[in-house]
């Protein structure tokens, strides 16, 4: 099970994401330049050059035509995936922390940080006819976050709702037609949420939190279904599209890391059974915390992006699929 090591970033990885078919893997980091890789052999296909600050988030649309990125230079940019050109650059008043295309690809949502006297806000834009004029247009929806800033975000079914994860551990569902909150999870997590990822059918999602747990939620009622416990903050978690498995990645906060030993087990990818909540495997590799995880859409491999600036793509052995959990 030899991993592909993708080395194209000079600083730590902030997010990685596969497109729908899984042939492309997108990565962004604090070095200002998102990359796109051919996931089969790890070849770098291109770089999206244009941001002036750390890129915090990215998402690719259903057809792999458009890419949206959000960065610390106070812009969200929409790119042409194939040509690497900027279609639109949208100025904001603080760093863009999350960005996602809707399933239809007609809309995109992004959220800004609570910083420099600005409150955290959630924005919706229409990207059907995205061009340079998008920077002057008003967003179709703008929701100020009065309590805690958004740290991760997902689109709900039929593009009618947005699920937000917050810095205080709250999760909320927003109706985008009414522009108001419809469901609040309360305090299932006791610390900030670092990442949220949907299951393949969208009926549930997994959260990764600083409170050292990952949890499985129903995406309509926000009922907590399962809890996966670790000893360290969880930075990212993903659900396998074909097996009842969840992978967790994390480690200490970046500023608390003093050792770079891979033997300590701090920086492993940890596999849990989705239903039984039991850990059954660990994979070593990164010299530092794992910041982002993603399963390949076919479920036969997964990728991890770390604080060490590497993206590792691991293909599973046949024993992984034959292993019956008892």
From Swiss-Prot:
One of its GO terms (biological process) is cytoplasmic translational initiation. PROSITE patterns: WD_REPEATS_1, WD_REPEATS_2, WD_REPEATS_REGION. WD repeats lie at residues 8-47, 50-89, 145-184, 188-227, 285-326. It comes from the Eukaryota. The keyword Phosphoprotein does not apply. It is found in: Cytoplasm. The keyword Repeat applies. InterPro entries: eIF3i (IPR027525), WD40/YVTN_repeat-like_dom_sf (IPR015943), WD40_repeat_CS (IPR019775), WD40_repeat_dom_sf (IPR036322), WD40_rpt (IPR001680). GO terms for cellular component: eukaryotic 43S preinitiation complex; eukaryotic 48S preinitiation complex; eukaryotic translation initiation factor 3 complex; eukaryotic translation initiation factor 3 complex, eIF3m. Its main location: cytoplasm. GO terms for molecular function: RNA binding; translation initiation factor activity. Keywords: Cytoplasm, Initiation factor, Protein biosynthesis, Repeat, WD repeat. PANTHER family: EUKARYOTIC TRANSLATION INITIATION FACTOR 3 SUBUNIT I (PTHR19877:SF1). Component of the eukaryotic translation initiation factor 3 (eIF-3) complex, which is involved in protein synthesis of a specialized repertoire of mRNAs and, together with other initiation factors, stimulates binding of mRNA and methionyl-tRNAi to the 40S ribosome. The eIF-3 complex specifically targets and initiates translation of a subset of mRNAs involved in cell proliferation. Belongs to the eIF-3 subunit I family. Component of the eukaryotic translation initiation factor 3 (eIF-3) complex. The eIF-3 complex interacts with pix. This is Eukaryotic translation initiation factor 3 subunit I. The lineage of its organism: Eukaryota, Metazoa, Ecdysozoa, Arthropoda, Hexapoda. The gene is eIF3i.
